[in-house]
């Protein structure tokens, strides 16, 4: 592959040419301050993210999946977002899939040459049976990773909504995707180390995207996380607290409703606020496509 000297993310940072000579306090301050630029880059990408959220919510309402694709740090960040959807929003695990160049072993160590294989990118999309109802999120700091670009092309050809996240303007990945999310973070404090603010920007963008999608899919009531899956003691207490906050019920009533709803915060809230039993609350929620507001009329 020819050396690419034009990518913003590969340029030496002009403010930190003497980084190795910094005292420890200055070094830490420089690294921390540069991370703040990641959040600003995501804010600038707001319109594209909003477009991605609207398009994704529409497909997911019809039963589609979220498919995350990337190599190295970008792939691991996609995997992280995918696995957090189930405990946070009770999103079905089978509807969140992460494809990482090099497969599962690339989670723990670099797999030589994996990101350079266009064939593997296209093959992984085919093996996942990606189709028109799916939303495919493709991440690459450079925006030119062959595995990820080929996956984008294959997913788009299959009719999926493709959303590309890259940290360099004019990146091939952005051109290959239906929705282009440019996270223009510029040079890194450590030249070319895109696990720093480029990766941070990708993480913030994924947090923003998936959280906004779940709000649109009625996984949040007010600003309360009402579709949380109470899978440990901490989350059991959170479910109780959320039920009390949303319904105004006391602890005993909230506990009784949660017991009757088998731990479903949404169901318990509708039961308490509407004064109905669990089957009736479930029917109301189903008719309202999971919306508590809709179920309460």
PLM region descriptions:
Residues 61-62, 157:
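Residues at the C-terminal ends
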Residues 1-41:
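Cofactor-/ligand-binding subdomain signature composed of acidic, glycine-rich
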């Amino acid at each position: 592959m020819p050396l690419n000297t034009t990518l913003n993310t590969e340029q030496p940072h002009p403010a930190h040419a003497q980084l190795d000579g910094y005292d420890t306090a200055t070094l830490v301050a420089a690294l921390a301050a540069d991370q703040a630029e990641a959040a600003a880059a995501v804010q600038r990408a707001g319109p594209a993210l909003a477009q991605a959220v609207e398009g994704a919510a529409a497909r997911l309402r019809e039963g589609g999946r979220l498919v995350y694709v990337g190599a190295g740090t970008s792939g691991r960040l996609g995997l992280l977002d995918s696995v957090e959807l189930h405990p946070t929003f009770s999103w079905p695990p089978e509807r969140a899939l992460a494809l990482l160049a090099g497969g599962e072993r690339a989670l723990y160590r670099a797999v030589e040459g994996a990101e350079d294989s266009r064939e593997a990118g296209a093959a992984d999309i085919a093996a996942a049976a990606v189709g028109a109802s799916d939303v495919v999120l493709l991440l690459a700091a450079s925006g030119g990773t062959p595995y990820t670009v080929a996956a984008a092309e294959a997913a788009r050809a299959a009719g999926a909504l493709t959303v590309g996240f890259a940290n360099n303007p004019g990146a091939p990945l952005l051109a290959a995707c239906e929705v282009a999310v440019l996270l223009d973070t510029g040079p890194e404090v450590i030249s070319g180390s895109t696990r720093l603010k480029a990766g941070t920007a990708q993480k913030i963008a994924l947090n923003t995207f998936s959280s906004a999608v779940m709000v649109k899919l009625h996984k949040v009531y007010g600003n309360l996380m009402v579709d949380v899956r109470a899978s440990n003691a901490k989350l059991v207490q959170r479910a109780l607290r959320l039920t009390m906050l949303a319904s105004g019920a006391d602890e005993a009533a909230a506990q009784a409703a949660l017991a009757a709803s088998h731990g479903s915060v949404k169901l318990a809230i509708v039961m308490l606020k509407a004064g109905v039993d669990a089957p009736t609350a479930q029917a109301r929620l189903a008719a309202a496509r999971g919306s508590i507001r809709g179920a309460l009329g």
